[in-house]
Curated annotation (Swiss-Prot):
Binds 1 zinc ion per subunit. Its cofactor is Zn(2+). One of its GO terms (biological process) is queuosine biosynthetic process. It catalyses: 7-carboxy-7-deazaguanine + NH4(+) + ATP = 7-cyano-7-deazaguanine + ADP + phosphate + H2O + H(+). SUPFAM superfamilies: Adenine nucleotide alpha hydrolases-like (SSF52402). Catalyzes the ATP-dependent conversion of 7-carboxy-7-deazaguanine (CDG) to 7-cyano-7-deazaguanine (preQ(0)). InterPro entries: QueC (IPR018317), Rossmann-like_a/b/a_fold (IPR014729). This is 7-cyano-7-deazaguanine synthase. Pathway: Purine metabolism; 7-cyano-7-deazaguanine biosynthesis.
Amino acid sequence: MNQASDEKALVVLSGGQDSTTCLYWALRRFGAGKVEAVTFDYGQRHRVELDCARKIAALAGVRQTVLPIDTFAAIGGNALTDASIAPEEGVRDDDALPNTFVPGRNLVFLTFAAAFAYTRGARHLVTGVAQTDYSGYPDCRENTLKALEVALRLGMDSRVELHTPLMYLSKAETVTLAQQVGALEALAWSHTCYNGEVPPCGHCASCELRAKGFAEAGVPDPLVERCQAEAQGL
């Protein structure tokens, strides 16, 4: 069995609101010097998030590694990796999966992350997936993650543990958690917009959910404030 440290953690950092919050949660949970980040370049439409992830990792003072996975772009069929498909606007009110669903993405990401953590002697994997609010992505559900954790433990003969701090939090509760763990400054550099726009487009489902969460939490969005200040030359 791999003798991984009970203290080391690897965070899957996309550069978005949720993964940024989880990075700072991990720093509180495991301590500075015990946390690394891994980011996946999978041919995503919103390429700006890769730059955001680098900036946020630097702000947090954690080592970051970017791993390329070009398979999803080759498969296509969804709005995040296929340039011919525009992301749907607004939040769906039915049970159908949105066209931003990338089949198998989180399963692949976490499998690669587990392999990477194995080589680093880290036992803990932290991811920002959540099954509340919107999307209904099947690879964000707790039962999926629990099953994957079992498979990773068996397949790598390790004691890997998946942490999902946001699993049952609403977007407003996620904002509150970000406050508690000191992530608000870093969230000014995070990226959520499916269209890859800065300032955020404001009308894709991801932008709408982010805005709703900050509004319900009664907290100004640091990203919006930064963009407004830059537009005013401040």
